[in-house]
């Protein structure tokens, strides 16, 4: 009976510990409810009384404006990384945070410039907001499909109300709002081709529980470049790469969370509803008739596809267009059949695919591992095949989008050839 009494003692102690934990959680929640008082605050915008908004205190300025129908862009999801949610507070600005100090000059800080994603609304404020943000709207989209187009990249296709078309331009982006959610990565197999299972299994990425039920909605918005072009409405498309934790011993680090927005998108199934806002963007096509070279990697495929299909299929442009797309292997290549078809149909479009790590199955299909134009880093292949042979490389436009290392390598290469920054259009968050 001794072992039974010991087991009983352990059970009682465990129950007491769990009960204490629940009591502490309840105390914290009640304290927040009664000690943190929420009060109304007025946001006077552009010195126009008709634009004054009344919001609850405690939220970020970014979230408060979004709730009031003013969609300030925040491509990074409110993490103070993209620096695009700038707002000038002309009256009652609080002391700048470190994120503000690293973003604005001393003079700008004195003028009241702040990052709205970091500024908490605690009292009445007077603001200056660019008028273009008043034109941004929200839509509800319905998931049509959400299939993997590469091992870690999905093509999310949404349908929006055709009576309210989204007035976006190629190169633009929309923000996706993420509600509280919980998902198990094994459920993502429902929208994943089995050819991608093995890599996910190798890195133990299935059967991972991602719990964001207590999500702070202030940080639950992220921007994604559109892969579709306007003529495809009411369908809109995105290419989204999953943000996994770093790998430790071929498994995701359990101490690092999965990407909030990308995990939400990977969990979506046909029929699900998604809230989107926008449109935003500055990486549009320059209408000066210069030839365009697209230097695209990974999920930057969104940015490239939107521009290229609009130029060829919608505008019927005769501009010389060249696409260089970089992927690890043929399994990771996106939109190959579509681009090969366009290349046959349009003599002014040229498509180059570069693989950095072709698989044995790629070599078995005839991929030339020893050809530096086909098997290489994209920026090296591009220089060997095209850039070094251009008599006047400064006469071209260069549209760049991809992972951070891809972007930095391309920008360094172009700078080495004397390409002015004004001839480069960079989408730095599309991947």
UniProtKB/Swiss-Prot annotation:
Cofactor binding description: Binds 1 [2Fe-2S] cluster.
Pfam families: Fer2, NAD_binding_1
Transmembrane regions listed in the UniProt entry: 10-30
One GO biological process term: sodium ion transport
Residue ranges constituting the FAD-binding FR-type domain according to the UniProt record: 136-286
Main location: membrane
PANTHER family: NA(+)-TRANSLOCATING NADH-QUINONE REDUCTASE SUBUNIT, NAD(P)H-FLAVIN REDUCTASE
This protein's name: Na(+)-translocating NADH-quinone reductase subunit F
Lineage: Bacteria, Pseudomonadati, Chlamydiota, Chlamydiia, Chlamydiales
